[in-house]
From Swiss-Prot:
This is Histidinol-phosphate aminotransferase 1. PROSITE patterns: AA_TRANSFER_CLASS_2. InterPro entries: Aminotrans_II_pyridoxalP_BS (IPR001917), Aminotransferase_I/II_large (IPR004839), HisP_aminotrans (IPR005861), PyrdxlP-dep_Trfase (IPR015424), PyrdxlP-dep_Trfase_major (IPR015421), PyrdxlP-dep_Trfase_small (IPR015422). Keywords: Amino-acid biosynthesis, Aminotransferase, Histidine biosynthesis, Pyridoxal phosphate, Transferase. Its EC number is 2.6.1.9. GO terms for biological process: L-histidine biosynthetic process. It catalyses: L-histidinol phosphate + 2-oxoglutarate = 3-(imidazol-4-yl)-2-oxopropyl phosphate + L-glutamate. It comes from the Bacteria. Homodimer. Belongs to the class-II pyridoxal-phosphate-dependent aminotransferase family. Histidinol-phosphate aminotransferase subfamily. It is an enzyme of class 2 (transferase). Pfam families: Aminotran_1_2 (PF00155).
Amino acid sequence: MSRYWSDIVRQLEPYVPGEQPALAHPVKLNTNENPYPPSPRALDAIRRELGDTGEALRRYPDPVARRLRETVAAYHGIAPEQVFAGNGSDEVLAHAFQALLQHDRPLRFPDITYSFYPTYARLYRVAYETVPLADDFSIVVDDYLDDAGCVLFPNPNAPTGRALPLADIERIVAANPSSVVVIDEAYVDFGAESAVSLIARYPNLLVVHTVSKARSLAGMRVGFAFGDAALIDALTRVKDSFNSYPLDRLAQVATQASYEDEAWFQATRKQVIASRERLVGALAALGFDVVPSAANFVFARPRSHDAATLAAQLKQREIFVRHFKLPRIDQHLRITVGSDAECDALVAALRELLAA
């Protein structure tokens, strides 16, 4: 702490990102990255943009990512004016906190959810309330039907992996016409229904996507928001008051090419889903209680061992999973669905540790 810090910095509790181990060959199952490489078309697009000399890199990128937004809009069957592009979905969410979620009534989100939400709320001084999940970690829809303030939650939820059906999401959006409802769909491609189809009917709905998970582009930092043009304009006003050029040239062309390669997207998405079900079965056989998952990770509780101890023991073997020292979930592990070889290495290590 320094005497030069502002009051708000003194009060912050920063988000703690997942560990990025500096090892040659870790089994990295702690940050929900895709185990498969990006679309070959994305790699080709990067090479074309660079050319032989990298001449393009001396020029600023398109500040509004027009071609990318047009491609993504066409993919979802909406207008480009209904698409916002930002530097990762975390930045998109940050802009939403500033542009849309600061009101007299508190913002509401689940008590067990993406831990960046309370961090952003404190940073931007947004009053908030947490709404308890049910005992099975599902969102209780009736708790959000009172039009009592803005609503934010991931679907599927993180770190639990549980998803609400689209009909329940529509109930929440319809019941809150006076406030913005933000659905964070970082993991939607692995088993949930997207709410993008609802934005034409609900001007209060904002849906956030990322290319970090299903499209294997976490290193490019690209995220989107979809919603009524007035909501998108609000995000753009914040963006242009903060950073007019959030997406570099390589990120724009790689992401556009990724959306143009549907065959690759579907093949890798289905492989992750198949590997997830395989991992769920293996963990259950080892005595874990596994929460039903519609994401690219599983949330599991070892019945006979301490979760934090297991995570530490796995780390000693260069296998990384995520443990949260938080109420209600401190005996759970969040495990990314890796390649089958990575999942097999995890299961083999757990089998040895649980038998010791």
